């Protein structure tokens, strides 16, 4: 079985799927040789004329530059410099419309030529075989050479990807696009330089075989190459004319029957493809030292009076070429297309400059090239799928692209589309399919860039967050270490930490306060127990209202303790907040606290002053307890007085114990007084009746009885007044008791007074009756 190289040398060819045979119309521009276009009045040089990044500026406005002088510099392999096409002055650096389907503006250098054609110093390398591949790649990169037959990929970067792994070098001379003849005429006139460029690339890549693929519609170019390549180990293979056989993947399929893997490049399968225009530029850059400052441009279409190929300086406005070579616009449908009718795009205006990838300016009439503005609905005929050279599904791709379903477009391998235009050419509905695909690709590319930028921003944020946390931890460690060093230093000096000392002082003060609080708790518990016992006793005796005097005392005691704790907390706060306070401040705080305590004690003493006069309490006695004791003493006094006044029932009053409640004592006293008055009235009445019945008795003296009754009434009134005063004063001393009911006491006192008055009135009426008698 023959190897692949042997099959190629034997002349075997293969074919790719799909493809079309459009009307070529190449004879308009390939009949005349290439001539130099005139130097225009202004050159517009975009900083980015290739796939990749724009270079960094080396010039500024007002600088004079020489022909071939670098205007930008590169810092990465995807950057290419641009050079001055002629000598002149930099008049502006500003955005201008560039050659792109979008019609957008990019930063450009505007050069005003001085028509002197003064060259920059060149460094030719005619003996290139003595140079290393790396040196040659660097010279190619410095010359700013990019792919001149396709998308404009940097040539040095492409060659570098095939170092030490290229087996077959393929030279693309097919030029399958209708109307375009730039490569055809270039091969006719500059075949020797093209062969020199091939030899330079062979010296860099060292392939096993070199193949030149050229369509059979270029017989003169084939003859020129065969003559220039005599005695050279190269294979010139003439292939059938079929569009798009000039595509990289399609030409590889035709010549080698190999297919580039999905998402891969030809170097992955040991192949390298270069355009004849790029090879001629490589020869000029290495052998003559000239950078890429001009290219061959085809001026064709029925609107040109003299269609031909010209050497145009990069940056030449299209309008200058139109004016020089007899362009006459169509009156009804003026159009200018950069590129061919299949893959080209319409220019927004004629001031767009020529770039490294601009190989043709097509100016057709409306009859020569019809417009595709009459888009109709898809009829699902399937011709687009049959014509696709990449075996895609153009119909489904157009649907998803129109609906902006870009995820589905990617699933259908939209990125593999070479935008050849074969599908749009055969579409009976005249749907501009390539435009939909270009827009979808641009949107997908934009979203991909945004996603990458978001990922980079996320990574930067996470790195920043980690750095901030790391810095925070380092600061905390530094602070801890510094505090530890200070503590050790103070300990060595015999001192102590001020903060620790303040904390110890606060703890000591709290420890001093704890015993006081603990001593109060048993008293509170005892008071609560007494209150509960009295409430239970009241409930058993059937009293309508329980006795809540103990709860009142308990609340008052709690309030007093709260005031004392508040004063003590104030002293503790002052002590803790002022670590370095002197003895004077402490003395002032203590004096203020003592003054507050004395004031509170005086207020409580004044409220119980009058009851305390009867029974003076000791210095340590509680004013509330003193008031209770005074009330009990008054009740005992009244009971003793009642015992002396009424001898009829001396045992009815039951003296209360020292622990009696003042309210109960008051109620008992009132009841005793009422009973005494009632007994007095009964005694008076009984005395009056026997006196009337036996007026002549020796023991009954009416005058003495009247005097005795008057004395009794006077004593009763006096006792009532003293009782009223003594009852009013304790009530005023404790007006805020929640459990005591002042209204009931007042009602009882009023009832007692009313009964006393009634008894007095009855005794007076009896006395008057006796006097009348």
Curated annotation (Swiss-Prot):
Every 4Fe-4S ferredoxin-type domain range: 368-398, 408-437
Lineage, highest ranks first: Bacteria, Pseudomonadati, Pseudomonadota, Gammaproteobacteria, Vibrionales
Gene name in the database record: rnfC
Organism of origin: Vibrio cholerae serotype O1 (strain ATCC 39541 / Classical Ogawa 395 / O395)
Compartments where found: Cell inner membrane
Alphabetized InterPro entries for the sequence: 4Fe4S_Fe-S-bd (IPR017896), 4Fe4S_Fe_S_CS (IPR017900), Ion_transpt_RnfC/RsxC (IPR010208), Nuo51_FMN-bd (IPR011538), Nuo51_FMN-bd_sf (IPR037225), RnfC_N (IPR026902), Soluble_ligand-bd (IPR019554)
Cofactor(s) this protein cannot do without: [4Fe-4S] cluster
Coiled coil, from the record: none
Protein residues bound to [4Fe-4S] cluster 1: 378, 381, 384, 427
Cofactor note: Binds 2 [4Fe-4S] clusters per subunit.
Protein name as catalogued: Ion-translocating oxidoreductase complex subunit C
Molecular function via GO: 4 iron, 4 sulfur cluster binding; electron transfer activity; metal ion binding
Cellular component aspect of the GO annotation: plasma membrane
Biased composition (Low complexity): 533-545, 605-618
The keyword Repeat appears for this protein: yes
Membrane-topology descriptor: Peripheral membrane protein
Purpose: Part of a membrane-bound complex that couples electron transfer with translocation of ions across the membrane.
């Amino acid at each position: 079985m023959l190897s692949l190289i042997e099959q190629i040398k034997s002349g075997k060819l293969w074919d790719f799927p799909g493809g079309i045979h459009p009307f070529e119309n190449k004879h308009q521009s390939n009949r005349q040789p290439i001539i130099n276009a005139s130097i225009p009045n202004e050159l517009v040089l975009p900083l980015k004329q290739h796939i990749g990044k724009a270079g960094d500026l080396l010039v500024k406005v007002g600088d004079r530059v020489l022909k071939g002088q670098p205007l930008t510099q590169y810092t990465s392999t995807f950057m290419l410099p641009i050079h001055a096409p002629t000598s002149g002055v930099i008049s502006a650096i500003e955005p201008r419309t560039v050659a792109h389907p979008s019609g957008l503006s990019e930063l450009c250098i505007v050069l005003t030529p001085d028509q002197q054609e003064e060259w920059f110093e060149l460094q030719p390398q005619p003996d290139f075989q003595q140079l290393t591949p790396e040196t040659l790649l660097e010279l190619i990169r410095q010359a700013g050479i990019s792919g001149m037959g396709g998308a404009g990929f940097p040539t040095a970067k492409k060659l570098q990807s095939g170092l030490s792994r290229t087996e077959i070098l393929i030279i693309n001379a097919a030029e399958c696009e209708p109307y375009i003849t730039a490569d055809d005429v270039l091969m006719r006139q500059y075949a020797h330089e093209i062969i020199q460029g091939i030899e330079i690339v062979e010296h860099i890549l060292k392939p096993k075989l070199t193949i030149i693929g050229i369509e059979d519609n270029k017989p003169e170019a084939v003859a020129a190459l065969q003559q220039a390549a005599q005695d050279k180990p190269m294979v010139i293979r003439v292939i059938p004319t079929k569009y798009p056989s000039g595509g990289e993947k399609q030409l590889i399929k035709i010549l080698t029957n190999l297919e580039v893997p999905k998402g891969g490049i030809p170097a992955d399968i040991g192949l390298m493809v270069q355009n004849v225009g790029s090879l001629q530029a490589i020869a000029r850059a290495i052998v003559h030292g000239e950078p890429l400052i001009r290219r061959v441009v085809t001026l064709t279409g029925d609107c040109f009076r003299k269609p031909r190929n010209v050497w145009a300086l990069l940056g030449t406005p299209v309008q200058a070429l139109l004016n020089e070579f007899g362009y006459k616009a169509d009156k009804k449908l003026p159009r200018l297309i950069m590129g061919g009718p299949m893959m080209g795009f319409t220019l927004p205006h004629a001031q767009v400059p020529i770039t490294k990838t601009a190989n043709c300016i097509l100016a057709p009439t409306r009859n020569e090239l019809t417009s595709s503005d009459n888009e109709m609905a898809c009829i699902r005929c399937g011709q687009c799928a049959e014509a696709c050279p990449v075996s895609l599904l153009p119909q489904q791709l157009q649907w998803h692209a129109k609906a902006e379903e870009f995820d589905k477009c990617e699933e259908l391998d939209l990125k593999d589309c070479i935008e050849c235009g074969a599908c749009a050419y055969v579409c009976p509905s005249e749907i501009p399919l390539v435009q939909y695909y270009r827009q979808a690709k641009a949107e997908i590319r934009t979203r991909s860039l945004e996603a990458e930028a978001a990922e980079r921003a996320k990574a930067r944020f996470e790195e920043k967050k980690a750095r901030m946390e790391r810095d925070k931890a380092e600061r905390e460690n530094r602070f801890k270490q510094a505090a530890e060093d200070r503590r050790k230093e103070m300990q060595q000096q015999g001192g102590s930490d001020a903060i620790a000392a303040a904390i110890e002082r606060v703890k000591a003060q709290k420890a001093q306060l704890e015993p006081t609080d603990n001593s109060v708790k048993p008293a509170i518990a005892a008071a609560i127990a007494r209150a509960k016992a009295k409430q239970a006793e009241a409930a058993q005796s059937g009293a309508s209202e329980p006795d809540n005097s103990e709860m009142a005392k308990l609340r008052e005691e709690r309030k007093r303790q709260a005031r004392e704790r508040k004063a003590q907390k104030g002293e503790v706060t002052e002590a803790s907040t002022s670590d370095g306070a002197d003895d004077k401040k402490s003395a002032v705080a203590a004096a203020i606290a003592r003054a507050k305590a004395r004031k509170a004690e005086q207020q409580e003493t004044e409220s119980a002053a009058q009851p305390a006069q009867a029974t003076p309490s000791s210095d340590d006695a509680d004013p509330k307890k003193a008031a209770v004791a005074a009330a009990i003493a008054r009740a005992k006094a009244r009971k003793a007085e009642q015992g002396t006044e009424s001898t009829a029932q001396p045992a009815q009053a039951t003296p209360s114990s020292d622990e009696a409640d003042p309210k109960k004592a008051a109620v008992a006293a009132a009841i005793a007084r009422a009973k005494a008055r009632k007994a007095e009235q009964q005694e008076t009445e009984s005395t009056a009746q026997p006196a009337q019945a036996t007026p002549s008795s020796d023991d009954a003296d009416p005058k003495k009885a009247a005097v005795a009754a008057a004395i009794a009434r006077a004593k009763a009134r006096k006792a009532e007044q003293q009782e009223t005063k003594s009852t009013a004063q304790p009530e005023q001393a404790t007006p805020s008791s929640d459990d005591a009911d002042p209204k009931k006491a007042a009602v009882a006192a009023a009832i007692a007074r009313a009964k006393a008055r009634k008894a007095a009135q009855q005794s007076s009426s009896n006395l008057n009756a006796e006097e009348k008698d």
